[in-house]
């Protein structure tokens, strides 16, 4: 009968660990496979991955570059296609958050022209690209700026 306490791995599936420093006959006696002297033979030996033998490591030889703007965390671009999915006529930041077009942490939004747009809407206090501005005005929309 098969039971949980009789389950065992297949023969040869588990390797037996190497028993080092257990006499000459084992093949790993005396120095335990570490060789004689030197940094790697000592206990507690751990050499950094980036260590290059005293030579200045690659990560310090290469120049620093770039940065991640913290402004990008609170800024997002949206397209006119995203606006066309909103049923309301007046669109501001709160409306975009309400319809999950932008996340809660976003504070600045820029509308860019992408796709077609044929709904006259009023855009309040949002940044807008020149192409998108022209398209919204051509379909009878309005852009209101300022607080």
UniProtKB/Swiss-Prot annotation:
Keyword Ribonucleoprotein on entry: yes
UniProt family annotation: Belongs to the universal ribosomal protein uL15 family.
Pfam families recorded: Ribosomal_L27A
Organism: Blochmanniella floridana
GO biological process: translation
Superkingdom in the source lineage: Bacteria
GO cellular component assignments: cytosolic large ribosomal subunit
Protein name: Large ribosomal subunit protein uL15
The keyword Ribosomal protein appears for this protein: yes
InterPro entries: Ribosomal_uL15, Ribosomal_uL15/eL18, Ribosomal_uL15/eL18_sf, Ribosomal_uL15_bac-type
